[in-house]
Amino acid sequence: MAKPLNERFFIPHEIKVMGRWSTEDVEVRDPSLKPYINLEPRLLPHTHGRHAKKHFGKANVHIVERLINKIMRSGGSHYKVAGHFMRREHRSLNSKKVKAYEVVKEAFKIIEQRTGKNPIQVLVWAIENAAPREDTTSVMFGGIRYHVAVDISPMRRLDVALRNIALGASAKCYRNKMSFAEALAEEIILAANKDPKSYAYSKKLEIERIAESSR
């Protein structure tokens, strides 16, 4: 007679991200971002691009995987931080998901050591604090172009927050002995605490200030 399934195989009672951190108690306070921050229990945050060609498919990608995807990008040639092409310093992560996964995992360990809290919860707080609510767009009236303030959709708010967190981490370790994992951990912690030293949080304040002046 065959043994029961739970005796033949190890079946965990709770699935934890990267085998270490649970998402059950992670809380999203921002009601507009809540539907788009995916916190489904997932051992390995890797969907192999199955949502890439689906409209709004990013909403089904785990938030940790979206962070991993952001740090893999080399950035556009026109994008600068403090006058330098910061993202190019970490082109070794470009399209290398396993390496980017290990960087994020190491950053989460550092966050856990420094704060004593679940790093996924700290990441969610950082995203909420770094997501701008307003931005500017250009419209043309009578052949003259004007900048006007517009509300930002929740999906774009999340994209901008993750992009600026990744850029801030790159800026912190640019020409510095600090590792990328340490810089990423520091940027997430600073953004979660609304510290002006955080690139992502200060960038959010700048975007909203420009939008307010364009009303």
Curated annotation (Swiss-Prot):
GO CC aspect terms: small ribosomal subunit
One Pfam entry name: Ribosomal_S7
Keyword Ribonucleoprotein applies: yes
Annotated InterPro entries: Ribosomal_uS7, Ribosomal_uS7_arc, Ribosomal_uS7_dom, Ribosomal_uS7_dom_sf, Ribosomal_uS7_euk/arc
Domain of life: Archaea
GO BP, one annotated term: translation
Keywords associated with the record: Ribonucleoprotein, Ribosomal protein, RNA-binding, rRNA-binding
Alphabetized SUPFAM superfamilies for the sequence: Ribosomal protein S7
SUBUNIT field: Part of the 30S ribosomal subunit.
Family: Belongs to the universal ribosomal protein uS7 family.
Functional note: One of the primary rRNA binding proteins, it binds directly to 16S rRNA where it nucleates assembly of the head domain of the 30S subunit. Is located at the subunit interface close to the decoding center.
Protein name: Small ribosomal subunit protein uS7
Organism whose genome encodes this protein: Pyrococcus furiosus (strain ATCC 43587 / DSM 3638 / JCM 8422 / Vc1)
Organism classification: Archaea, Methanobacteriati, Methanobacteriota, Thermococci, Thermococcales
